[in-house]
């Protein structure tokens, strides 16, 4: 199960990208004394820094984003992260009411808090954060895009995803995977993926006729003296969640046996760190962590 420390670490990163923060950053924001240098403060730790972006949904500019009031967990997932909202979420993680983190992570009093804290997100702000981390870590950093990046805005619709591809190129990701990208159609996705300049990874996407892989499954990187294997896992239920006619030539699925083989092969090739860049969704990734052995880090998207 995810620990409180792990979750708050991830939440702090997300809140920082959104222009809010936890602890001291939250207090500065509440006092309207938050400056760019406070957001950019970064203490390098360890050999490798993983920077994970996911589910941008082609939103280029800051916006007001209200967390949902309902997130239903089924069976053993009921009442567990990420199926906690509002007061239950704040109680679980000891978040003060009306604080910056309460605004970023829960829905209560959203209108009044939004008037105080403002909009969230914006690719220009994300770019500033990424640039700062890259300056501190250099070749020891990996920037990984978890998908749901190219579509779901007016500009991405009008450009067939090209606007987001061009903008993301300025951030220089090392790899990505996908979900809503596939609604552009198989031909367009392949066209864009082949021109990215970095790998579109998806070990679980296959040609429906011959079961050949459509995309590379993994990529090995040398970072901080460590071989890092990044394995891509696209949204496994794409033909169910999205119109099947958009991707008639491809099949998906979790393909956990194939995933295990990718992990084993990466280890055999000397990987000291195996990262799953996933768009499974949190609940599926929890199960994957139980079933597939040898993965060290799962960067989870979709949920």
Residue ranges and their predicted role:
Residues 2-303:
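Acidic, metal/ion-coordinating pockets
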